Structure formats: C-alpha cells, structure tokens
C-alpha cells in the first residue's frame, strides 16, 4: 500500500515533510 508522502515501507513521514525510519 502507498501512504501519502510516498515513503518506502518501514519509514514514516515527519512534520517537516521528510521520511525517517521507524526503528
């Protein structure tokens, strides 16, 4: 599934619009 923001699986969207790993 694709999330808004287009981060790869295992990553989340941060408040500044970037992607960071959730681990």
Curated annotation (Swiss-Prot):
Q: List the disulfide bonds.
A: none
Q: Which InterPro entries has this protein been placed in? A: GBP_PSP
One GO molecular function term?
cytokine activity
Keywords from the UniProt entry: Cytokine
Found in which tissues? Hemolymph.
> What Gene Ontology cellular component terms go with this record?
extracellular space
Functionally, this protein is described as follows: Causes rapid, rigid paralysis when injected into Lepidopteran larvae. The physiological role may be to reduce hemolymph loss following injury and promote wound healing.
Q: What protein family does this chain belong to?
A: Belongs to the GBP/PSP1/paralytic peptide family.
Protein's UniProt name: Paralytic peptide 2
Phylogenetic placement of the source organism: Eukaryota, Metazoa, Ecdysozoa, Arthropoda, Hexapoda
